[in-house]
Every structure is written in C-alpha cells, then in structure tokens.
C-alpha cells in the first residue's frame, strides 16, 4: 500500500484526508523529530509531510527509496534542499495563501504591542501594580498616522499594508520588483531600502528567506533608522543580524523591536530577553485554527494528487 510519513502532528482535517487514501505513519514523540527517526520514517515512504522545523537535507532524501513528494507544512521551504529533491525527481510543495491573514494580523499586533507597551504593561499590572493614572506614566507611541516601511510586498506584506492603511498610515515598501498595480490598490509607495529605513516609524519584515537576504538588516541599516523607529520581524529570522539588533537597542539607535522569528531558531539570543522594549513571540505567525486547518488540507490534497498520478497545485521546485 502507498505510504505517507508525517514528521509531526498536523490537524485532523488533513490527517483524516490522507488516511482515506493511504497508509499513514506520523511521528508523535516528545519534541521535534530527530534526524535518525526521520531517516527511518521516510525509508519506505512514497510521500513525506514535513514541518518548517523539519530539516530535509540530502542525507534525508537519500534515505528515501520511494519518495515522490515532500509536502511542506508551511509557506516557507528553506528547510528543504529543494534543488537536490528536483534532481531526484521529487516534487516539493508548500502551503501559500493560508498564512496570509493570520501573519498579517500578528504583524499589526506586534506593532501595537511594542509601540503601546502592552506586554510590558501586562507584566507590571500582574506583578508590582501601579499607583493610578498620571500624565507622564507609561507613555508609548501612537501608530495611527505614522509611516510603515514594509520589506517584501508579497501576499503577507500586501495584507499588512491594507491593515496599516486602516490606521491612516503612510505605506512605503521595498523589494526586488516594483508592484505598480498593488501600489495603486493599496496606496503604497515603492522606495529603495535606504529611503525606507530613514523614513519609516515602523519597519516590518514580511519577506521569505533566501541566501541573498541573509543579514539584510545589520549595523549599517540600524544606523540609518530613526531613533524612534521600531523593527518588526514576522518574516524569517536570519534576515536580521540579532547581535547587531542587540547593539542597536543597547545604544538606543532604535526605540524597540518585536520578533516572531529568530536567527538561530528555536534558540533566542539571550540578550534580547532582557529588554523591556522588545516583544518576543514563539513563531506563531500562522498559528490560528483557521490557517493551520487550511494548511493541513493543502498538504493532504497535494500529496493525494501526486500519489494518484496528478500534478500537485503548489510545486516550488
């Protein structure tokens, strides 16, 4: 019987779809799957459902004798050696679109949390408490009417821009290509990175990762930002040099930061945890019931298509 191996628990809606068609084995151990367990799991599998936290390198691919598809449960796919998979005639798919609203919502939530000191205020209220309302007490920054600079105006970046416009924000964006139709629809302005860094009050990273973006935001870029600016990263961790971010915060080169992704994920640079003006979330960009169920359906349906001889919808290689 055709076999599918899943590298970690996924929502039942996708799991049940797969079980209707194939023999399914799913890793259900404590923590993330280790390499040897994954190698053993894919040895006789026709399909692998991988997670963003699952490293699928050449060694893993070579361990699979029958593999036809790697369906990645996530919009990103930099955890997979997609080029080598193609050399082995293995399709790699992802789950685009499903993450858009959830991640855009979180991006705006991070902006509000760090600018209005919501997390800091929650901690104060639960611990020492406060003496009451006072004119100079616990001031933050308003979001309405400010300028947002979006790095990566793809689906998620575009959704962030639409939400920002509801706050009467001016929208700047940068990326490898200008998107004139989206500019007109949203009311955004295309600028180069330096112009964005110098003018934005909130800089959001919503780009997918590729090696050319490694440490795109480094000491030089922090030095170009306003001293009242905030950096928001809901894209990919390695786009930001976290040590340079720590130094920028130490030197008050920027006012604060909010991160959902990390350079050395799942490890978080310890120094970041000490700043009250930094909000940290555990990579929950698309962690909603709606998005995760949709992602499960996508990986299941693309796997079913491939193993039934049809072309998957979301091939990335």
From Swiss-Prot:
Keyword Oxidoreductase: yes
CDD domains in the record: 2-Hacid_dh_13
Keyword Oxidoreductase in record: yes
Catalytic center residues: 236, 265, 283 (proton donor)
Similarity-based family: Belongs to the D-isomer specific 2-hydroxyacid dehydrogenase family.
Protein name listed in UniProt: Putative 2-hydroxyacid dehydrogenase SERP1888
Keywords recorded for this protein, A-Z: NAD, Oxidoreductase
A single GO molecular function term of this UniProt record: NAD binding
């Amino acid at each position: 019987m055709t076999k599918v191996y899943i590298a970690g628990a996924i929502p039942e809606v996708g799991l049940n779809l797969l079980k209707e068609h194939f023999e399914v084995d799913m890793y259900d151990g404590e923590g993330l799957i280790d390499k040897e367990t994954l190698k053993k799991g894919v040895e006789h599998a026709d399909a692998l459902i991988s997670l963003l936290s699952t490293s699928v390198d050449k060694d893993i691919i070579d361990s699979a004798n029958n593999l036809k598809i790697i369906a990645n449960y996530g919009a990103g796919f930099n955890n997979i050696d997609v080029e080598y998979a193609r050399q082995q005639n293995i399709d790699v798919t992802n789950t685009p679109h499903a993450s858009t609203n959830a991640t855009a919502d979180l991006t705006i939530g991070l902006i509000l949390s760090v600018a209005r000191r919501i997390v800091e205020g929650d901690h104060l209220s639960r611990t020492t408490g406060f003496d009451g309302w006072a004119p100079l007490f616990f001031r933050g920054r308003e979001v309405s009417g400010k300028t947002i600079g979006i790095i990566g105006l793809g689906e998620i970046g575009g959704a962030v821009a639409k939400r920002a416009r509801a706050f009467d924000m001016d929208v700047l964006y940068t990326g490898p290509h200008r998107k004139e139709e989206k500019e007109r629809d949203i009311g955004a302005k295309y600028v180069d990175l330096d112009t964005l860094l110098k003018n934005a009050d909130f800089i959001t990273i919503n780009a997918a990762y590729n090696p050319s973006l490694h440490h795109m935001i480094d000491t030089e870029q922090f030095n170009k930002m306003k001293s009242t600016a905030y950096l928001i990263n809901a894209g990919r961790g390695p786009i930001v040099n976290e040590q340079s971010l720590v130094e920028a915060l130490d030197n008050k080169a920027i006012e604060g930061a909010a991160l959902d992704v990390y350079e050395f994920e799942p490890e978080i640079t310890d120094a970041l945890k000490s700043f009250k003006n930094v909000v940290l979330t555990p990579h929950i960009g698309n962690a909603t019931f709606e998005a995760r169920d949709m992602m499960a359906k996508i990986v299941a349906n693309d796997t079913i298509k491939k193993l039934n001889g049809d072309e998957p919808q979301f091939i990335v290689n």
